[in-house]
Amino acid sequence: MSDFYQDFNKRRTFAIISHPDAGKTTVTEKLLLFGGAIQLAGTVKGRKADRHATSDWMEMEKERGISITTSVMQFVHNQHVINLLDTPGHEDFSEDTYRTLTAVDSALMVIDVAKGVEERTVKLMEVCRLRDTPIMTFINKLDREGREPIDLLDEVESVLGIQCAPITWPVGMGKRFKGIYHRYQDIIYLYQQGSNAKKIDATQIKGLDNPQLDELIGDSAKELREEIELVRGASNEFNLQDYLAGKMTPVYFGSAINNFGIKELLDDFVEYAPGPQPRATQERVVSPNEETFSGFVFKIQANMDPKHRDRIAFVRVCSGSYKKGMKLSHLRIGKEVQISNALTFMAGDRSHTELALAGDIIGLHNHGTIRIGDTFTQGEQLKFTGIPNFAPELFRLVRLRDPLKSKALLKGLIELSEEGATQVFRPLNSNQLILGAVGILQFDVVAHRLKYEYKVDCIYESVNIACARWVYSDDDKAMSEFRTKAYDYLALDGGDMLMYLAPTKVNLTMAEERYPKIKFCATREH
C-alpha cells in the first residue's frame, strides 16, 4: 500500500454545492474521470441508455435525472486520497445536504456562467459560512454564451460576501471559447471539444506574450491580454490563509461536459484544500492526529443494495484509524461493537476496506440501532456537536390501501425517518401516521420507496398542521401540565421525542405565550 494512503494529511474530504442544473453531477463525473475512478463519464443525455451518472444510483434518481441522496466517492489524484461527497441537487433535500456539509473540510461551488449566483447557492453558502468552510469556485458551461466573467465575480462578492481570486481566466465563451489562461502558471490551455477522453494533452502555450498565441487564436490573444491587464488591477490576488479561513474563494473557469478546466481545478484543489480539521464535541475538541478512533454518523441510507435490503450508516472518521475487526464503543446505546466489515464507497459500488483514516468516510451495516448524530469511539465518552435536525414545514396524513400492511408501513416509515429522508409523527390521541418533510419532493421519494422497497401502497392526504416544534422543559411539573392540556396537539417523532403540531402559526404563538416554561424548538441536535 502506498505511503500516502497511510497519511491522514493526504486526505481531502469535500462536497460540491450548486443550484440545480449548474452542472454539479457532470463536474463530479469529470473529477472522477481525471482521478482515474471511472473510464467513461455517464452524461445526462445518456440517461435513457444504461449509462447513468455514477453518483445517481438510486432508481428514482435515474428516472428523474437529479441526485437525491448523498453519495460518497473515493479516488486518488497526485498522491492524495480524495473523498467526494455528492449532495442532492434538488432544493427539497436541504436537510440531507446540510448534514453532509458537517462532514467535509471544504467545498466546491459550481456556478452556471449564464445564470450566476442562484437562490440555492445562496442558502448552501450560508451553511458553509456557519463553519467557515473553505470554498473553491468553478464557473461552468463556458462553451455556451453567458455573462461577463468580471460581472460574475462582482456578483459572487456582493451576494455571497466572499472575496474572489481568479486563478484561471476564460479566453472568450460560447462559439468564441478558445481556452483558459492560468494566471499563476502563465500558461494558456487551448480548448478542444469532446467529452469522454481525458484531455490531459490539451495544447499548452507558455507565456501570455508568446507570439505563438497570436498565430493560433488570432485577435482573441489581444483581447485576452487586455482583459488580464484589467483583472490584475481589479481583482484580489490569491491568499492561502484567507481561503483556509473561508474569507476568499479561488475561482476557476471551464466546461465540465467537455472536460475542460477540470484538471487545473483538481490539481490546485489537492495542493491547497485543507486536510482533516479538528472537530468540536460537547466535551473537548478532537484533533485528527490523535491515535484513538473517533467518528460520527452524518447519514443513514436504506437499501443501497435492493437485493440485500440493507441499511448503511455513513461515518466521518475524525481521529485515529479504523482497522478491520476493531472494537468500537457505540456511545448512545452504551455498547461495544466489533466492526469487521466497514465499507468504502465508489457510488453504489461498495468494497470492504481494511483501513480508514481521519477524513475518510466509512459505511457501517446498520440493523436499526444506529441513528444520525451517533458517535463511535474507542471508549472515550464524546458527543460530536453541530449535526442538525430541522422541524418539517410540510405535512401529509398516510393511509394504507391495504389495512393488513400496517406493520410494514410503520417499519418503512421509521427506517426512512432514521435516514433523515422524512420525519414520521404518531399523534398521542390517535393511531394516525403523519409524514413531515422540508420539501415537497421528499413525499414523492417516500411514496416511491414505500411502494417499491417495502411493497406498501398508500394514500397521502393533506392534514391540518402548519408547523411542528420539539418541546422540552427543565420543569417536570410544567411539562406534565402541558402534556395534559395540549394533549390533542402532541405527537411522538421517529426517535420518540415529543413534538407540538400546530394547526396554525397563530396557534403556535399562543401556545408559546401560554406555556412560558416550555421550550418550542424548530431545530435540535441529533
UniProtKB/Swiss-Prot annotation:
Residue span, tr-type G domain: 9-277
CDD domains: RF3 (cd04169), RF3_II (cd03689)
Sample GO molecular function, one term: translation release factor activity, codon specific
Domain of life: Bacteria
Record-annotated disulphide pairs: none
Compartments it resides in: Cytoplasm
GO cellular component terms, A-Z: cytosol
Keywords: Cytoplasm, GTP-binding, Nucleotide-binding, Protein biosynthesis
One Gene Ontology term from the biological process aspect of the record: regulation of translational termination
Binding site for GTP: 18-25, 86-90, 140-143
HAMAP family to which the protein is assigned, alphabetical: Rel_fac_3 (MF_00072)
Family: Belongs to the TRAFAC class translation factor GTPase superfamily. Classic translation factor GTPase family. PrfC subfamily.
Function: Increases the formation of ribosomal termination complexes and stimulates activities of RF-1 and RF-2. It binds guanine nucleotides and has strong preference for UGA stop codons. It may interact directly with the ribosome. The stimulation of RF-1 and RF-2 is significantly reduced by GTP and GDP, but not by GMP.
The name this protein goes by in its record: Peptide chain release factor 3
